[in-house]
Regions:
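Interaction interfaces in information-processing and related assembly proteins
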Residues: 1-207
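Cys/His-clustered metal-coordination modules, chiefly Zn-binding fingers
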Residues: 184-262
Length: 262
């Protein structure tokens, strides 16, 4: 049976706590393979995609997209991921191969990421809806959005850089809730949503919405041709007869004949 990435939204009316659960394993697997990621970058890409899928649960406009850009002082360099309102995921890490760390199963954030700055942007074509900067996703939720919420992420890759799983949970205590959001911590991510919620202490939570997610990029051969066509005539004349253009968001490469741009 073909596996499908999902986002599930649940709500416990008694405790006034909402939970969003995502599984982006298939999208992360395809993107990591497309970028030729090593095990470490595949791991962090998987967790970043889960974060974007969680935060994008609140996108409302038809063409809206939520992006997370992270810059860090560690060797990974950062990442850029995006999830659209209709569930399309794409993204990349700055470094794809980390020779010093790829041979080890350890994922030490302090060594691989160092200090971080995260920018979360919600936008539609031609307009930014909102933007926030923080040192972490939880910091963005608490600081920029003033919300009592926490994100929990889980990812696993093997030494062949295959993503084995990529999942996430966003827990939020609503303003009229008397609960502390830190009380609801998932211990396992490899179980059905209803079991995970019971494990977290929310057995009475009810499903609100389910949406499918997928890897999809807006790049195309036509966009590649248009990009070269935007160069001035002198610049195009200096190009070889064929040129390869790689999309940095998904790793797909297009071979363009430069005479197509004239």
């Amino acid at each position: 049976m073909k596996k499908v990435d999902l986002r599930e939204e649940w709500y416990d009316d008694k405790k006034k706590v909402s939970v969003v659960i995502v599984d982006v394993t298939e999208s992360a697997r395809k993107l990591a393979a497309g970028h030729l990621c090593g095990p470490v970058s595949a791991y962090y890409l998987a967790k970043a995609l889960a974060s974007a899928a969680l935060l994008a649960s609140e996108t409302s406009e038809k063409d809206e997209a939520l992006s997370i850009q992270m810059k860090c002082t560690g060797p990974l360099g950062g990442f850029n991921v995006e999830c659209t309102a209709d569930g399309a995921l794409r993204g990349y890490t700055e470094k794809k191969v980390l020779d010093e760390f790829d041979g080890s199963p350890d994922r030490d954030d302090r060594k691989i990421l160092g200090s971080q700055q995260i920018q979360v942007t919600r936008s539609v074509p031609g307009r930014i809806i909102s933007q926030g900067i923080s040192g972490s996703i939880d910091g963005y939720l608490a600081g920029s959005l003033q919300r009592r919420a926490c994100i929990y992420l889980s990812a696993e890759t093997n030494q062949e850089a295959e993503v084995l799983h990529a999942r996430g949970v966003l827990v939020e205590a609503l303003p009229d809730s008397k609960e502390s959001v830190s009380e609801f911590i998932p211990e396992r991510f490899d179980i059905p949503a209803c079991e995970l919620l019971a494990q977290m202490g929310l057995p009475e939570a009810k499903p609100v919405k389910t949406a499918t997610l997928r890897f999809e990029c807006r790049c195309s051969p036509e966009r590649a041709v248009a990009m070269l066509g935007a160069l001035d005539e002198k610049e195009r004349a200096e190009l070889p007869s064929e040129i390869d253009i790689t999309c940095h968001m998904c790793g797909r490469t297009f071979t363009v004949k430069t005479d197509e741009t004239r």
